Amino acid sequence: MDVIQNLFMGFSIALTAQNLLLAFIGSLLGTLIGVLPGIGPAAGCAMLIPLTFQMGPTGAIILLTSLFYGTQYGGTITSVLMNVPGEAASAITCLDGYAMAKQGRAGVALSIAAIGSFIGGTFATIALVFAAGPLTRWALEFGPVEFFALIMLGISMLTGLAGKSVIKALMMGVFGLALAMIGIDPIRGSPRFTFDRVELMDGIGFVPVIMGLFGLAEILENAEQPFAQMVLARMSTLIPTRQDIRDSVGPILRGSFIGTALGLVPGITNSASSFLAYVAEKKASKHPELFGTGMIAGVAGPETANNAHANGALIPLFTLGIPSSPTIAVIMGAFMMHGLIPGPLLFKEHAEVAWGVIASFYVGNVILLILNLPLIGIWVKILKIPYGILCGVIMAFMILGAYSVSSSAFDVAVMLLFGVVGYLLRKFDFPLAPIVLTLILGPLMERSLRQSLEISQGSFGIFFSSPIATVLLALAVLFLIAPAFKFFRKGKVVISGDGEAA
């Protein structure tokens, strides 16, 4: 009964004229960002944060979250029509989506993708609604010891699953923590690593850092390759047949579950959800050999999982205060800039914000379903603009966004610096996600650590006095060492195959 009452309260907030407009704008901009190569949801959210300073927290988060899941559908449009994924998660859709487009069924593919995205997002939102109560009640029992262990688990999961090299991921995590230490010591009030620069007294702003790492670096990398004019597939009807709908029901249901479940796990990207959904459909199909030739299930499953993952990834943020991806970390940073800490206390102390934003997920998914299909022609025209011009426009907005955070040229310099740093890190295959996660979670982790040590008078034994903290820390260690065991097992197999091992 409490859930129903809270949802009614949430919808009364989400359906106000201002919040409806913000959800519409976020969905529209999110789709545009998803369509355009060279800028992802993390940089897109970071660019919009300065615009939210004059808004209330509910409207600000509605704008950012609607942009986030709007990008998921935007990447589908170019995947189907041009065989070019606007987002990494839509790459798998190219296989059957573009094949359908060449058969003159691009409209059907996009319609099924839109319907699947709507159902997947709604499924994940329902999961959030019913998970919020139990998870927040459990997390309300946490003290600083348990919160430190929980943050360590979130960081270790993202680090342990972030790419091929755990060592590189750990290095990036430490780098992010070092950045988080810059500024005034929250306990003693003394400056740390500021080098007598007034601009560093408040620390390194995460908005220019993220815009540089995920926006400018992406543009620099894309600028190396000339963008040829893509051949646009022709589109006929948008209305799927009854057989198309029947063939999509199973993939949409499976994709909803896969995307929501994997969205809960920090470090698992929506690309992984889309790929696993595609694999699941091939295994479930009576004709797996036809995948890649225009199977509707190859579009419905991955696209549903993609959007379900985007909404499912918000569950650990809202209930536990743990971001599961760089974009979610940016949204968490926006919460903090508005004086709110996402997690169990959000539902207790700011229920109107929590439930208003959750209700807006339903609204945003409906807006995306209604909005995107009629606007496909506009998105295609935007894609015909030369990439050099698009780059210039995007970079101008980035510079303006970085400057508007604190009206400081220093923030612009930080963005440009981290754009170059991000570009170089990409070249050497260093993951960027751990930097963002530790930069935002670093201050929270430090505060929990120091509060715990003050309670125990400097004894680290306090972290093993709590059963919950002990389990969480053990899981954190497991996620960090698991890749090393995997590497060892591979090495053992190679030696045995040589015939020289005993």
Report residues per predicted region:
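Membrane-embedded alpha-helical modules
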Residues: S111-F227, M337-G491
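Transmembrane alpha-helix interface/packing and boundary motifs in multi-pass membrane proteins
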Residues: S27-P41, T71-N83, L158-G163, F257-P266, ...
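A structural-propensity feature for long, helix-poor, extended segments
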Residues: F68-V80, G86, M295-L320, S324, ...
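Re-entrant/interfacial helical elements at transmembrane boundaries that shape
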Residues: P41-L51, L64, S79-A99, F130, ...
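Helix-loop-helix hairpins and the membrane-proximal interhelical loops
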Residues: M1-A60, P191-M295, V380, F397-Y403, ...
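Membrane-interface alpha-helices at helix entry/exit sites of multi-pass transporters
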Residues: T58-I62, A99-G116, K286-G298, P326-A329, ...
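Flexible loop linkers connecting adjacent transmembrane helices
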Residues: M47, L81-V108, P134, G143, ...
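Short helix-coil transition sites and intra-membrane helix breaks within transmembrane domains
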Residues: I33-A42, V80-A91, F123-A127, L262-S271, ...
